Amino acid sequence: MTSIFGYPKEELQLDLVAHGFKKYLAEQIFDWIYVKNIYSFDEMTNISKTDRNKLQEYYTIEPLKIVVQQQSKDWTVKFLFQLADGYKIETVLMPQSYGNSVCVTTQVGCNMACTFCASGLLKKTRNLSTAEIVQQVMMVNRYLATTNERVSHIVVMGIGEPFDNFDNTLKFVNIINDPKGYQIGARHITISTCGLVPKIKQFAELKTQVNLAISLHAPNNTIRNQLMPINKAYPVEKLMDAVRYYIELTNRRVTFEYILIENVNDSRETALELAKLIRGLNAYVNLIPYNTVAENGHQRSTKINKFFETLQQQKINCIVRREFGHDIDAACGQLRAKNEGVIRK
């Protein structure tokens, strides 16, 4: 059996027909799951009992298991979920003034080995299925239902590299963006990549309205090679060519994410080099205070404001990202790594 959560509506229609159901059943199922938050075939009362029983022969509809749930002083909520095969993943709910944003995970572990990230301490075991990505949003919506709220924004920035799980990530986007699904607008969805150049170009050619964020963290190959091994395969020059290709095809603005690390990438000279690198692009810089992971040996920069001011003086659009859940291990991979004894508690 396969999970009902893994099907975009058009695929579910085809699969239902192949099993002898009527095509329109797909819209009924989508309405029950994604609009009414019902996760049991038995409760889908406008579907015949015969069809409900038959659906259970072909599809599973079980939720994820919550292993740990932590709430921060700033109302951020971090979930550690257990998958059917026992592996664990993280999801973070970040309440905002404009709605509820959720950071989802796309892989069990990560092979990108960025030196500042807790996710890389646990190597990639496998990709998440589309269903397992969708279920993260489902579980957060279930949590929010107690206060009559819903998820309004998605950032695909959790554990793993989304473009290393390209097809399942894009199917996930299809489902949550569907007018009969979670109805989350494409411009309320952001996918972050560490720089898989061929996939950035492939994503550009889809001409979707989904936002693209680039985990840059350094303006040159010397520093980026030190922080992000992926740069040795796709150096800054090739990455920026892919970004320009994306902007040209989509006319969409790109976000450059930049974690500031003490005495590594936070000097005035580095800020000036960053400004030169992205000047003239339809883009802005998201400066991120570092959530320290002791095992990685890096420290949070003490020069965040000076770096920000330098970029502003250079007429570069930039913001300093608000911190979420600093007191509850809300940085990517921290909670799972602590739960599995990889980093200190």
Curated annotation (Swiss-Prot):
Catalytic function, reaction form: adenosine(2503) in 23S rRNA + 2 reduced [2Fe-2S]-[ferredoxin] + 2 S-adenosyl-L-methionine = 2-methyladenosine(2503) in 23S rRNA + 5'-deoxyadenosine + L-methionine + 2 oxidized [2Fe-2S]-[ferredoxin] + S-adenosyl-L-homocysteine; adenosine(37) in tRNA + 2 reduced [2Fe-2S]-[ferredoxin] + 2 S-adenosyl-L-methionine = 2-methyladenosine(37) in tRNA + 5'-deoxyadenosine + L-methionine + 2 oxidized [2Fe-2S]-[ferredoxin] + S-adenosyl-L-homocysteine
UniProt subcellular location: Cytoplasm
Enzyme class: transferase
Domain Radical SAM core: 96-327
EC number: 2.1.1.192
UniProt feature coiled coil, ranges: none
Main location class: cytoplasm
Keyword set, alphabetical order: 4Fe-4S, Cytoplasm, Disulfide bond, Iron, Iron-sulfur, Metal-binding, Methyltransferase, rRNA processing, S-adenosyl-L-methionine, Transferase, tRNA processing
Residues at which S-adenosyl-L-methionine binds: G160, E161, S192, S215, L216, H217, N291
Residue positions of the active site: E90, C332
Cofactor(s) required, per the database record: [4Fe-4S] cluster
InterPro entries (alphabetical): Aldolase_TIM (IPR013785), Methyltransferase_A (IPR040072), RlmN_N (IPR048641), RNA_MTrfase_RlmN (IPR027492), rRNA_lsu_MTrfase_RlmN/Cfr (IPR004383), rSAM (IPR007197)
Cofactor: how bound: Binds 1 [4Fe-4S] cluster. The cluster is coordinated with 3 cysteines and an exchangeable S-adenosyl-L-methionine.
CDD domains in the record: Radical_SAM (cd01335)
Keyword Mitochondrion: no
A GO term for molecular function: rRNA binding
GO biological process: rRNA base methylation; tRNA methylation
More about this protein: Reaction proceeds by a ping-pong mechanism involving intermediate methylation of a conserved cysteine residue.
Name of the protein: Probable dual-specificity RNA methyltransferase RlmN
Organism per entry: Spiroplasma citri
